[in-house]
């Protein structure tokens, strides 16, 4: 499994997990977050590996569809980049202005 896909699925899962069924959440968490194999998940839930595989593939598509419609993750990434640029600009241009730094920190806390 490639790392980029794993990271993306984990990120999408963080944003949209509450929209999934309990079984979808459990399978995705075990597979992506806990690095369980299909066989281990199948054994845990007493189902076939194929059933686990199908469920995970369906759930991946569902997560991608949610992102395509809602853009929560992509908007988060853009906001994070802008915030980093703002922070760098303030640090270079207004290094002694603690008030601006405080506001940036508050925004960062909201984003996390």
From Swiss-Prot:
Gene3D superfamilies: Winged helix-like DNA-binding domain superfamily/Winged helix DNA-binding domain (1.10.10.10)
InterPro entries cross-referenced by the UniProt entry: RNA_pol_sigma_r3/r4-like, UPF0122, UPF0122_fam_protein, WH-like_DNA-bd_sf
A Pfam entry, by short name: UPF0122
Organism: Enterococcus faecalis (strain ATCC 700802 / V583)
Full protein name: UPF0122 protein EF_1701
UniProt similarity note: Belongs to the UPF0122 family.
Function (record text): Might take part in the signal recognition particle (SRP) pathway. This is inferred from the conservation of its genetic proximity to ftsY/ffh. May be a regulatory protein.
